[in-house]
């Protein structure tokens, strides 16, 4: 409350009477009502309701053409004319966001991707930057180009840690030690500035707030948790949106608006909150927030993908919402690790979640799979059978008996729309990570015997990688680090712990030799990363207990 009282003293008047000064409450772009073809267009309410009519909530929604407004009836009845006018102006959103969020009318062309350089145009040289990376999909989303920049003061922030670890202890103590050594060993970056947090679970939020400096920018890909983090900070420290003009002057909301933090804190937060959505690239402009005594900037997400294909074109909308909405993640999988069993077959038996990928174990292998991706799983005789079933599901308009297992659209109901990847040799367990989708844990059981490489077929345009199981890796590394008083590294130095996969031709029979060939090509300019290049591949895989993770190599 002290922070809020301080904010109320000397607060600068913020006029809501001229709508052109207001930004879209969802994407932060400047609103305009002149040209429907240009960004920021909104439909102006025809008129404000007459206070004598005591309108209900549905009337207000109609005036905003179903835009995002959640006023309580009690607040309206107290002073309908005043509160309705102010809240309409503060919560109005542009036509693009309204269509996408409330009418399921999503046009990818209206949500253009931005590059890193596009976004850095918003960030002055020498600024404090928080590079936001979802830990659940590590190492995907981690951008060395951001961490290595000399013109920025960059801190790595690993979000969604509750989707990897059982409790806060590992996140607070063990992750920073591991990441310091990982960055040094893998990327030659010497940095102590790493935080692992969970905005939903409030893990390390106080520590994060105490650390970040005034005028800090949040930088990362779309849907990595920037807005969720901001909203957690706003609630915890009574934060609010501010405007900063070209001279650096901070324009805060009016005293009347700020007073609502006392009288109606729930509605106050709804007005001030950052727009959180499962839709990527929703944020189109920089939005500044006053969080306690500090200014924090939410930047639009940037893309590093070379593919023009979007998940919205491939995956069913309902499935995609489950994949992207962090609050829907079921943490019981982290604690219980319930697995499904699958045996590799001579017909190419496969495991899938919604048709988003097809995992094909080698013949005779016995596998356990722990799924951290929402949606029911299904096994098929082979990939062709799975694709045929899901094609029928799309043609049946939901009446097919297996429709609940189908999470893809008809555009990828052909085998040619998938890429075949070979997973480099491993022993024990690995985690397969799909960018913007999630991960699964794959474990081979029984006495080790090489039976062939595992394969995974993925729609073109989706990025994939593997890692050693992250929680166990960090826990065991920390134990080793403590027992040796820091002499032993928390992050293994004797082997790579992450790797890209190797694309194979659909008819490639000798995948092991093909993997070695691709490995040599990928490491041609990184000779120091090469391992076991003189070993025969088939001899090498007989001794994985001693020669771990051969042909593992991650391309940043």
Curated annotation (Swiss-Prot):
Domain CP-type G: 113-305
Record localization: Mitochondrion
Keyword Amino-acid biosynthesis listed: no
Keyword Mitochondrion: yes
Record-linked CDD domains: YqeH (cd01855)
GO cellular component: mitochondrion
Keywords, sorted A to Z: Mitochondrion, Transit peptide
Transit peptide limits: 1-21
Main location per the UniProt record: mitochondrion
Functional description taken from the UniProt entry: Interacts genetically with prohibitins and thus may be involved in the mitochondrial lipid metabolism.
Protein family membership: Belongs to the TRAFAC class YlqF/YawG GTPase family. GEP3 subfamily.
PANTHER family assigned: GENETIC INTERACTOR OF PROHIBITINS 3, MITOCHONDRIAL (PTHR46434:SF1)
Protein name per UniProt: Genetic interactor of prohibitins 3, mitochondrial
UniProt organism field: Saccharomyces cerevisiae (strain Lalvin EC1118 / Prise de mousse)
């Amino acid at each position: 409350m002290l922070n809020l009282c301080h904010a109320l003293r000397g607060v600068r008047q913020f006029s809501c009477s001229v709508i052109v000064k207001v930004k879209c409450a969802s994407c932060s772009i400047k609103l305009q009502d002149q040209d429907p073809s240009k960004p920021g267009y909104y439909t102006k309410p025809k008129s404000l309701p007459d206070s004598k009519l005591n309108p209900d909530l549905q009337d207000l929604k109609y005036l905003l053409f179903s835009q995002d407004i959640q006023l309580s009836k009690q607040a309206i009845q107290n002073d309908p004319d005043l509160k309705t006018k102010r809240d309409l102006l503060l919560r109005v959103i542009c036509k693009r966001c309204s269509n996408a969020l409330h009418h399921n009318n999503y046009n990818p062309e209206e949500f253009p991707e931005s590059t890193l350089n596009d976004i850095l145009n918003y960030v002055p040289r020498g600024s404090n930057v928080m590079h936001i990376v979802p830990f659940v999909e590590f190492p995907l989303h981690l951008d060395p180009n951001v961490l290595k920049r000399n013109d920025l003061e960059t801190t790595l922030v690993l979000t969604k840690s509750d989707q990897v670890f059982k409790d806060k202890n590992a996140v607070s103590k063990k992750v920073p030690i591991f990441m310091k050594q990982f960055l040094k060993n893998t990327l030659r970056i010497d940095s102590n500035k790493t935080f692992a947090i969970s905005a939903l679970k409030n893990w390390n939020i106080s520590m994060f707030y105490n650390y970040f400096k005034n005028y800090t920018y949040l930088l990362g890909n779309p849907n990595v948790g920037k807005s969720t983090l901001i909203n957690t900070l706003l609630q915890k420290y009574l934060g609010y949106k501010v405007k900063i003009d070209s001279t650096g002057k901070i324009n805060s909301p009016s005293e009347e608006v700020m007073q609502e933090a006392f009288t109606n804190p729930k509605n106050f937060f709804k007005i001030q909150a950052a727009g959180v959505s499962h839709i990527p690239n929703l944020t189109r402009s920089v939005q500044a927030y006053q969080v306690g005594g500090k200014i924090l900037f939410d930047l639009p997400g940037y893309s590093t993908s070379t593919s023009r294909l979007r998940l919205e074109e491939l995956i069913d909308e309902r499935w995609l919402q489950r994949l992207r909405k962090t609050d829907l993640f079921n943490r019981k999988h982290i604690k219980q690790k319930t697995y499904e069993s699958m045996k590799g077959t001579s017909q190419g038996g496969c495991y899938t979640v919604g048709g988003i990928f097809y995992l094909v174990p080698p013949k005779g292998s016995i596998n356990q799979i722990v799924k951290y991706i929402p949606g029911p799983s299904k096994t098929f005789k082979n990939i062709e059978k799975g694709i045929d079933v899901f094609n029928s599901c799309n043609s049946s308009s939901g009446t097919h008996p297996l429709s609940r297992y189908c999470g893809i659209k008809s555009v990828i109901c052909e085998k040619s729309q998938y890429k075949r990847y070979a997973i480099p040799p491993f022993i024990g367990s690995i985690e397969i990570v799909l960018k913007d989708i999630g991960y699964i844990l794959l474990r081979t059981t029984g006495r080790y015997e090489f039976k062939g490489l595992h394969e995974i077929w993925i729609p073109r345009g989706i990025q994939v990688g593997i890692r050693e199981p992250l929680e166990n890796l960090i826990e065991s590394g920390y134990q080793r680090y403590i027992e040796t008083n820091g002499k032993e590294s928390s992050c293994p130095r004797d082997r790579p712990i992450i790797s890209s996969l190797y694309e194979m031709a659909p008819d490639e029979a000798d995948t092991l030799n093909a993997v070695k060939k691709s490995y040599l090509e990928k490491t041609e300019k990184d000779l120091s990363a090469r391992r076991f290049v003189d070993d025969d591949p088939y001899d090498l895989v007989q001794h994985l207990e001693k020669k771990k993770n051969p042909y593992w190599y991650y391309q940043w």
